[in-house]
Amino acid sequence: MFAMQPPPELPSASPEFTSVEADAAAELIRLALAEDLGDDGDRTGEALIDQEARGRVEIRNRADGVVCGLPVVAQLFETLDERVTVATSARDGQAVGEPGCLATVDDPVRSLLAGERTALNFLGHLSGIATQVAAHVAVVAGTGTRVLDTRKTLPGWRRLAKYAVACGGGTNHRMGLFDGVLIKDNHLAGRGDPLAVASAVTTARDAVPESLPVQVEVDTIEQLTDALRAAPD
């Protein structure tokens, strides 16, 4: 039998959910609600629930983790039905342990049922990212190491995924190809000399504004030695 090791204590972070994240969420919410409700809405809820019925539900965590996505949940229900109110009892970036209430959602039962799965999908996905990142951050705590993210995100989800990384205590790297230079093996191969790292760094630095960082990935000690001659960022 294998002895299970206790998970590392998860850190808490407090990133800001800005209008940029809200705009990104709005587009995803629109697509998600259209995907789930189609043109005819929630057939089951409308068939079984009186349109005047009012109620309250709690959103609760069932495991340890880092919360992320509560503002998206509120935004989703506001988009679905402006009569719905969401009151949070936790915050994004907060590490939670024992199962408890993260938020309460009030009013039209039809709307609560129509939006619950989509809201939980957002909350679960983003909290999962934040929790996994926090676990890695906890492992390297005290070493001076930062945990950075990449561009390997689901299309359309990058802004929110990177927000979730920040909620987990990770560090956002470039948002896209537009806001930084990262020289990779394919760039070096495309130039015809995979070992000429310093030359690529110098060429890139001369070609872009000074405000853009120029960074490089290396696979070997030889590449690292060559790259350091050009002092990449």
Place the predicted regions along the sequence by residue.
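Acidic/glycine-rich phosphate/pyrophosphate-binding loops and surrounding catalytic core
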Residues: 2-230
